[in-house]
C-alpha cells in the first residue's frame, strides 16, 4: 500500500492532520472511515473515487449520478452523504473521463509521487491489461531520479522514496489490490531494468549528481518510446540513415560511418582467409567464434541489407557481386547477448559504438582491398531498389551470336552482330506464346515503348541447342535487312550468358489463327488479308528469300487490320539458282516437293503454303486437320491436295486451286496472284481451275512407298520397291479422298485383294 505523505507537497508539520485523508494508515487505525478522523472541525474532502471509464464521450448529466456504484470500483465509505457530491471535480483527460474527490492540486501531487502523469495510469482494468502491457507507453516521473548504487532505490524531491515495483510485466494479468477492487497499475519498471535502459538508450553512464539536477521543476529529457521488458530490450528509435555517397575505399563501395561500418568492429585472425574463401564461392560459413557469411541471390525482390536471414539489424554489409550473378554479404560481427531479443536481430547482431569506427575502418579497408581483385562491390542504390519488384535488366553485348558458347554451337556459321535496340533498359511482361525454340513475351522500355520479346535459351546442349543457334542466326541476319509494312519489324537483339532476346514489333490482336477462332472471318476480310500477305511475300521473293512456314499462326494482325508476316526461323535466302533442299516447315502446309527429300524446291513452295493458308481462313481450320501428321505426309507425298469446299465463292475456289497445284512449275507467282479476280474484284471470264489427283508416276522416280505386310505405313526415300508395282498398287486401292483417321485408312488397305497386289 502506497502511503500519502501529506495531501500536498507542503511542510512536514501538517502531516498528522493530512494522514486522515489516507486509506488506513498505521497512526489512524481506521479513523479515516469517520468524518471525525480528519483531524479538524471542518471535514476535509478525501479521495472517494478513481475511475477510468471506457466511454469516449463524457456526459456530465449521466456520469455525475452516484447510483451507478456497481459499474465502478469505489473506495468511499457507505456513510458518505449525498451532499458531498458537490465537492466532486470532474477532470477529462484525453478520451477518458475520471471522477475524483478532494482537492485537485493534492491529487496531482499524489499522481506525481506515484510516478503517473495522468489518472489513467491508475485505472487500468484487468480486461485491458494484455493490450496495454504490450503497446502502452508507460509514464515516468517529471524529474529524473537519483539512483543509489548500494540499495538500488530511487529518491525524489521532499525525501519521498518508494521501493521497486512489484508488478511483473510477464504475467498474463495484473495482481489485484489488497482490497480486491481494482488491479494494480504498473507505476514504473523495476530499478534494475531502468538502469539498464539508461545504460543502453539514454546516457552512457548513470547520472547521480545532487542539487539542481534533480529539481522537479526543471524539465527533464522526454521518455523513450518504449520501456525495457522482462524478456529483453525492445527496438530503440530508428538509427540515422546510411550515407550512400562514394567512399575512399572504392568507387562502388559504402562509406564507413561512425556508427555504421561495412564489416564488424572486431576481426578474427582468419579474416583474410574467410575473404579468400568467399572469392572462391565457398558456401556460407559459421564457426565457433561467431563469424558468418551470407550468400544471397540477386533475384530476390527484397532489400538484401535488411532481409538477410542471418543479419537482420539494418546495418550495412559488403554486398559483392559474384561471377555467377549472386551477391555475397560478408558481415563479420561477434555474438552479443544484449541484442538477442531485438525485433530484427539475432545472436550475431551487435550495436555499434562510435569508439569502434577507426578500428572497423582499418579492418574493412584491408578486407575490401583483398576482395576487389576478382570481385566488384554492388551499388548500394541497386541493393535498395531490389525491395520493389525489379524489371529484367539486360546488359548489351556486341559479340557475334556464334561466340556465345563453344559447347552450344559446334558447327561453323556466319557471325551475326546483333542490332542494338533504341532503348537502354526494359522489363519483361506478359507471356504471349511459345514456339519451337523459345517463348514470346510482351516488353516495355523505359521510354514507354511496347514491343514483343522472343526469348531463347542458349544453354540447351545437344542437337536441339545447335539447331536453335543456327536458326536464330539465320533469322537475325534476314530480319536485319527487311523493312516492309507487311512484315514484322525487327528492333534489335540482346543476350546474356544463357539467354538471347530478339525484339520485334508488337501487334496486339495476335495471329490470324486466334482471330478466326474467336470471331470468324468474313469474305471481305479474307480478301483483304490475302492481298496483304501476297504483298509481303512478293517483297521476300524479290530478295531471294523463301519463308517456308506460311500459315495463319505466323501472320499477325494489328488494331488497324494490317497483317504482317512473322516467325522467320524457317526462312532461308537461297542461292542464285533459287533452290533449297532442307526438310523444314509445318506438315499440314508443306508442299509436295518439300516432303520429298530428293526434290529441290523454290519460291513455289510458299505459294502452296499460301493456298493452304487461304483455305484455312475460309474453313476456319488447317488443311488435313482431321489427320495425324504422318498421314498428312503420306497424302501429300502421293500428290494429293486438300479438298476445297464447294460452298465457297468461285473466285476464292479458283485462287486456292491455282495455288495448290501439285506440279510446282504450274503454280502462279505472287505478281500473277495479285492480278487474280479474287484480289482485284473483277468477274471471272474463264472456268474455275479443277484440282485433279495426279498419278503417282509423276513422283515415283524420286521416291518410293514401302507397303509392308503390317498395317503400318512407312515412307522411305530408299528405292526398295519397283515404281511399277507401287503404281499398280495405288491405282487398285479404293481409298476415299479424305479418310477420317489412320485406322480408317488401314482398314481400307487391308480390304484390298491379294490378287491385285500380286499382279
UniProtKB/Swiss-Prot annotation:
Question: What effect does gene inactivation have here?
Answer: Reduced chitin-induced MPK phosphorylation. Strongly reduced chitin-induced cell wall-associated depositions. Reduced accumulation of PAL4 and CHS transcripts in response to chitin. Double deletion mutant MEKK1a/MEKK1b does not phosphorylate MPK and is unable to induce the depositions in response to chitin. The growth of the double mutant is inhibited within 1 minute after chitin exposure as in wild-type.
Q: What are the Low complexity biased-composition ranges?
A: 72-85
Which segments carry the region annotation Disordered? 1-90, 122-160, 165-184, 195-239
Q: Locate the active site.
A: 549 (proton acceptor)
Q: Which GO terms describe its molecular function?
A: ATP binding; MAP kinase kinase kinase activity; protein serine kinase activity
Give the enzyme's EC designation.
Answer: 2.7.11.25
Keywords, ordered alphabetically: ATP-binding, Cell membrane, Kinase, Membrane, Nucleotide-binding, Plant defense, Serine/threonine-protein kinase, Transferase
**Uppermost EC category:** transferase
Q: What induces it?
A: Up-regulated in response to chitosan.
| Gene3D superfamilies according to UniProt | Transferase(Phosphotransferase) domain 1 (1.10.510.10)
Q: Where is the composition biased (Basic and acidic residues)?
A: 1-17, 25-36, 52-64
Chain ranges of the Protein kinase domain:
426-679
GO BP terms in the entry: defense response; MAPK cascade; response to chitin
Q: Where in the cell is it found?
A: Cell membrane
Q: Which reaction does it catalyse?
A: L-seryl-[protein] + ATP = O-phospho-L-seryl-[protein] + ADP + H(+); L-threonyl-[protein] + ATP = O-phospho-L-threonyl-[protein] + ADP + H(+)
Q: Which GO terms describe its cellular component?
A: cytoplasm; plasma membrane
Q: Which CDD domains match?
A: STKc_MEKK1_plant
Q: Which residues are recorded as binding ATP?
A: 432-440, 454
Q: Which Pfam families match?
A: Pkinase
Q: Which family, according to UniProt?
A: Belongs to the protein kinase superfamily. STE Ser/Thr protein kinase family. MAP kinase kinase kinase subfamily.
Provide the function of this protein: The CERK1, MEKK1a/b, MKK1a/b/c and MPK4a/b proteins are involved in pathogen defense. The pathway induces rapid growth inhibition, cell wall depositions and accumulation of defense-related transcripts. This protein is required for responses to chitin and acts redundantly with MEKK1b.
| This protein's name | Mitogen-activated protein kinase kinase kinase 1a
Q: Which organism is it from?
A: Physcomitrium patens
Q: What is the lineage of its organism?
A: Eukaryota, Viridiplantae, Streptophyta, Embryophyta, Bryophyta
